[in-house]
Amino acid sequence: MELYLDTSDVVAVTALSRIFPLAGVTTNPSIIAAGKKPLEVVLPQLHEAMGGQGRLFAQVMATTAEGMVNDARKLRSIIADIVVKVPVTAEGLAAIKMLKAEGIPTLGTAVYGAAQGLLSALAGAEYVAPYVNRIDAQGGSGIQTVTDLHQLLKMHAPQAKVLAASFKTPRQALDCLLAGCESITLPLDVAQQMISYPAVDAAVAKFEQDWLGAFGRTSI
């Protein structure tokens, strides 16, 4: 299982990489724009924040296959082993095929249906990213889409992995993992929720109180 953070916040990645067993960091154009740092600045910073380990993902901006390939080459000039995110449009599928031929790893993104995701994997994408919460918001079932996609990839494109994205709650992420999803990327707020349980803090405080009452100290 691979756990990613979906952010361009270098400070947060530095802090959470000490805690979480991170496989890397994913970004998209909206995330990069919100951080107001250009790719050539923030991508090396994110790489350094992870101690030079883990995989980075960044997305193309062009809308034609040829333009996407050119964008991918630019991204690889910034971080040599970056995984290039390509929206799974008709042009995106063509770009994924071209990038596969060049040996550039890709992730098929903006996936709203299992068939769409399967096509990106068959075209050569190493990862496929269904938008779980956005599918729910449009009246679909994000978890069912992940389940269907996972089964399709197992049967027809076993070299590809589902990398589920677009979460609003930890429960959505856990349901994806229970459906067999091999990798997930969490926004910072959901990642923080996964390690923030008031009952745990209360339990630790009670342990300290009892120990202090018995031994006059809080150390062993």
Swiss-Prot record:
Catalyzes the reversible formation of fructose 6-phosphate from dihydroxyacetone and D-glyceraldehyde 3-phosphate via an aldolization reaction. Gene3D superfamilies: Aldolase class I. It catalyses: beta-D-fructose 6-phosphate = dihydroxyacetone + D-glyceraldehyde 3-phosphate. GO terms for cellular component: cytoplasm. GO terms for molecular function: fructose 6-phosphate aldolase activity. It is found in: Cytoplasm. PROSITE patterns: TRANSALDOLASE_1, TRANSALDOLASE_2. The gene is fsaA. This is Fructose-6-phosphate aldolase 1. The active site is at residue 85. InterPro entries: Aldolase_TIM, F6P_aldolase, TAL/FSA, Transaldolase_3B/F6P_aldolase, Transaldolase_AS, TSA/FSA_arc/bac. Homodecamer. Its EC number is 4.1.2.-. Its main location: cytoplasm. Belongs to the transaldolase family. Type 3A subfamily. GO terms for biological process: fructose metabolic process. It comes from Escherichia coli O6:H1 (strain CFT073 / ATCC 700928 / UPEC).
